[in-house]
């Protein structure tokens, strides 16, 4: 019995020492931060799914208002949370070459080939390849597709609201974003079977797995094991969908000018390679295989569906809670559409400046890119501090923390579109507003996402006014 006790106690002692072995890392370097918990570090409430990680980082950001950087532990791994905007600008923009990896790469095949999760040379190639697809000139062709989906969406909403005017917004706008994304990406008309399939996939895509925590504790292990963060059902669906669409188009672009057309135009150029930085630099090339294309269409769908729907829901919630702002937006929508004969074009959107301010204020309060991560590619002396990051260490930026900092946004809980007047934007630090990220790894599809939200809001406000119901939550 005594032997069993000693063995058990020894085992627990070894485990305790192992899972706390790094917890003096920041203290030894005179970097302040919250006390870690055994095994979980500073993210225990996220691991047990009691609190979202974005709120944990926001709380840490707010707990150390005088610090430029804060030492934290993602599970047992020491990381640095950046608070100072100038430091963030150095990491995200000025010294980007040392921080161009997100550190979330999980596989070198299948869905892991997507531009969001890719790092290193693969990311550079993908970025150079796909950035031209998301310019205003290319995306203008998709506005007609969005507008057409919007018209069909409004007819559906009218039928629903004729029966019951009180509706939950998020399920409604998800119907629009699903239809918009699938037509703009794949040229698809949704039927009931496809809608049901996508609904099931959405729950799988947006269900958090514990793979993230494992990779936090053992950085890079998912890539080494070639293990996916996503359900095994997701990759075959996008692989089959991509192959089917490419076959239907004979492997060549059509005149639809949707995302698949633009990608097929790229594929006709064969292998893509990035520009060399130096004459002797090795160059990675990328062949646009069906698998590579499927990975990009997956991330385009995943990034554009739920984020746009959430943004629309929050925007409409704020308009319902602030009827004076809603009336101002409606007046601008009506006047602008009248000038453009009811058509939504690039010029139409450009002239709706107040709606654009409302959009940006919505993303300030409810940012899409809640957490920004970057990995140091070499030892790095953090500007304005005595802290040195070691190669491979991760920095964390809390978009929520910054967007709710009264130093940058007085009375941050208030919804105030005037924060994004041209004058206020000019006078604000460039890293004080980062809903889509910052620097060269900023979301490529942000313009598409903005237009998608604006088109839907314009269509809705042309027909409806929004009011809080008795079931509306006053806080999120």
Swiss-Prot record:
Enzyme Commission number, as recorded: 1.14.14.1
Annotated residues for binding of heme: 443
Keyword Metal-binding (UniProt): yes
Cofactor names: heme
Keywords assigned by UniProt, alphabetized: Endoplasmic reticulum, Heme, Iron, Membrane, Metal-binding, Microsome, Monooxygenase, Oxidoreductase
Membrane topology according to the record: Peripheral membrane protein
Entries under InterPro entries matching the protein: Cyt_P450, Cyt_P450_CS, Cyt_P450_E_grp-I, Cyt_P450_sf, Insect_CytP450_Detox
Function: Enables the insect to feed on furanocoumarin-producing plants and evolved as an adaptation for detoxification of xanthotoxin and other furanocoumarins.
Name this polypeptide is given: Cytochrome P450 6B5
